[in-house]
Amino acid sequence: MLQLHTIKPNPGAKHRKKRLGNGESSGLGKTCGKGNKGQKARSGGTIRPGFEGGQMPLHRRLPKKGFNNTRFQDKILIVNLSQLERVFEAGATVDENTLRAAKLVQGPCDAVKLLGNGTLTKNLNVVVDFVSASAREKVTQAGGTVTVLSEA
């Protein structure tokens, strides 16, 4: 029976610890694999990524370009028809609240968009913020309705 105190790592999954400074013949004696002197041989002797020895670094030499709107852009969550087919019964009304209850939409979002990936055989009444043309066509072919909140 598997118990916490009997669990062992797979063979070859763990590396042996390097024993540094244990004599010259160990292969890791004297300088312990750090070479001779210099900043990288000292304790705490690492330089930050991108540091070029005092020269103006590349990321500061290149010009700033473009515009970044990630803090203010709308977060639109995607739902596919295949997910609706799997979760909802025929005749159901699908909106943001029912999608959250079914765990198809999680976390904060500004809008929900329905995409046409998959097939739909049930007639559903879908109320979303955005819908693709293929999704709208498939829902209406299955006998359902699509209401877009931004158009209403």
From Swiss-Prot:
Cited NCBIfam families: rplO_bact
Compositional bias segments (type: Gly residues): 24-36
The protein's assembly and partners: Part of the 50S ribosomal subunit.
Keyword rRNA processing applies: no
Name of this chain's protein: Large ribosomal subunit protein uL15
Gene Ontology molecular function: rRNA binding; structural constituent of ribosome
InterPro entries: Ribosomal_uL15 (IPR030878), Ribosomal_uL15/eL18 (IPR021131), Ribosomal_uL15/eL18_sf (IPR036227), Ribosomal_uL15_bac-type (IPR005749), Ribosomal_uL15_CS (IPR001196)
Family, similarity comment: Belongs to the universal ribosomal protein uL15 family.
GO terms for cellular component: cytosolic large ribosomal subunit
Region span, Disordered: 1-66
Gene (name only): rplO
Function of the protein: Binds to the 23S rRNA.
Keywords tagged on the record: Ribonucleoprotein, Ribosomal protein, RNA-binding, rRNA-binding
SUPFAM superfamilies per the UniProt record, alphabetical: Ribosomal proteins L15p and L18e
Pfam family name, one: Ribosomal_L27A
GO term, biological process aspect, one: translation
